[in-house]
């Protein structure tokens, strides 16, 4: 039974270190699952740091994951969609590749930190949550076709003056899966995300001010059904939106107090629940949420440092 699983395994690893400038690690793991049988997981990591300014990391390997359709996606039960789970769902299997570079550039007597990352995942086996083939159904099925994920991220951070640091980050994603024989964008995955953070702490460390501006890229929604008027019940895509968060903190000897606000731009997703007035009807769906459902939120709080008391 899948609710009981025994997984003994063994792992071997080899590490090569050359003057702390080049490090190579190769590993191989073998496991036996009482449910899924035997599987082997290779992994390799390389780190090259020729100087204090630059370092490069790369990794590659295979990964496995046991799936639990409803436990991982129980939010989908908050709709009128019929749930169909194929009996032949297998363990997920994928190859993972990644490379990252870090630069520490001296600039005007300070250090500019730059980080670049790229990751690629290629699924060989995957549990697909198909909400496209039938708008009134959610179908958990085995992957039949391609499924992959590309992620690129760039981040820069610089202390312009004492106590003030500005950080900017941008992430671009390309995630696609085969649904009903068609390779499509995965729903609810934003195409990009941008982040700009400014943080300032007064010279004595008494006050701290944090401001974060976040840009969330648009994405795809599952296939819609047609209303009687001949129009779709919801749009096929959602647009990008911005969010502004602010927090002010006052530090004391053993405690601190903070006040702030989230989503100060006041953005709210319009009509997040489909057919909300008829929760027992065949068209009710509260699972198509992709953005905040509340406007600006304000808060105040207190922190205690127990280690100093």
Set out the residue ranges of the language-model regions.
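C-terminal beta-signal and adjacent terminal beta-strands/loops
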Residues: 217-224, 249-309
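Residue-level signature of outer-membrane beta-barrel architecture
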Residues: 15-16, 30, 38, 48-49, ...
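Outer-membrane beta-barrel channels and translocator barrels
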Residues: 19-23, 49-53, 94, 105-109, ...
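Residues on the lipid-exposed face of transmembrane beta-strands in outer-membrane beta-barrel proteins
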Residues: 10-16, 44-48, 99-103, 154-158, ...
